UniProtKB/Swiss-Prot annotation:
It is a single-pass membrane protein. Residues 31-174 are annotated as: Disordered. This is DDRGK domain-containing protein 1. Pfam families: DDRGK (PF09756). The chain crosses the membrane at residues 3-23. The gene is Ddrgk1. Its main location: endoplasmic reticulum. It is found in: Endoplasmic reticulum membrane.
């Protein structure tokens, strides 16, 4: 019986303790509600919590940027012509903010805003680097063009000097040839006058010796003939042509500077040979000419 009483007392005490605990908790909750401000209808949660609105943040940001603008404007603008190219990158963002060169980003700025402005700054730096590289490339190309033009001018000047030297050399050569021609012509005229004024017998003897020298040697080197009779080579050629024209001698001057004398009898023999054969090739004529035309000098025939 005593055990049942003790269990009942314990249960009663436990119920009382639980009731007191619940009552105390309810009272503490009721006291805390008046301390908290009731939410206001129509007012944003950020304003109720004391957080500045986005418009206020933008105004504060613009104020700070305007304060930093004079400092950025004082820096030298090295790339002034490229200002028009950077207008798009320097425009204000969605709320009209402009990032001046060298401006320090606000620590309180939002992460998205900061990333956007950092991207614009990186793009501006990249644009300036590209502009610098382009200017360097243009300067290098201009230098190479100038060097190429200078080299072309040097080559053109060298070519002009070479052509001028060739022209002067040609004129000098033609002048000397003309002087030689005039001297030869004058000497020929003087010699002709001497023949006319000299003794007629002496002239005839000299001409006869000239003709006999050709007939005796058969093949005469024109330079040797001129030396033998104290004439110039051209004078000797002119005299031979005159003698051929009047029929005194017959023969041919080859391209090696020799006169080959052919007598009348030998010409008749060649003509007879051609007439007999009817048609004669050059090879046959050349082969037969060795027998028809005697090219051995008279002095050699006498000694043999």
């Amino acid at each position: 019986m005593d055990l049942i009483i003790l269990v009942g007392i314990a249960i009663a005490l436990l119920v009382v303790i639980i009731s007191l605990y619940l009552l105390q908790k309810k009272n503490s909750t009721t006291e805390a509600k008046p301390a908290a401000a009731a939410p206001q209808r129509g007012v944003p949660q950020r304003a109720q919590e004391g957080v500045p609105r986005r418009a206020q943040i933008a105004r504060n940001q613009r104020n700070r940027l305007r304060q930093n603008a004079p400092v950025a404007a004082a820096a030298p603008q090295a790339e002034a012509p490229a200002g028009s190219d950077n207008d798009d990158d320097a425009q204000a963002d969605g709320e009209g903010a402009r990032l001046p060169q060298g401006a320090v980003l606000d620590e309180k700025m939002g992460a998205k805003k900061r990333a956007k402005m950092e991207a614009k700054e990186a793009k501006r730096v990249q644009r300036e680097q590209e502009l610098y590289d382009r200017e360097q490339r243009k300067a290098k190309e201009a230098k190479e063009d100038a060097e190429r033009k200078q080299q072309e001018e040097i080559e053109a000047e060298a070519e002009r000097k070479k052509a001028e030297a060739e022209r002067l050399a040609k004129e000098e050569r033609e002048r000397k040839e003309h002087e030689e021609y005039l001297k030869m012509k004058a000497a020929f005229s003087v010699e002709e006058e001497g023949f006319e004024e000299g003794d007629a017998d002496e002239q005839d003897n000299l001409l006869a010796d000239f003709i006999q020298y050709i007939k005796d040697n058969k093949v005469v080197v024109l330079e040797d003939l001129a030396v033998a009779f104290k004439l110039k080579t051209q004078q000797a050629i002119d005299r031979i042509q005159e003698l051929q024209a009047d029929g005194t001698i017959t023969g041919v001057i080859d391209d090696r500077g020799k006169f080959i004398y052919v007598s009348e009898e030998e010409l008749v023999a060649v003509a007879k040979f051609i007439k007999q054969r009817g048609r004669v090739s050059i090879a046959d004529l050349a082969e037969s000419s060795n027998n028809l035309i005697n090219l051995t000098p008279v002095s050699a025939e006498g000694s043999s």
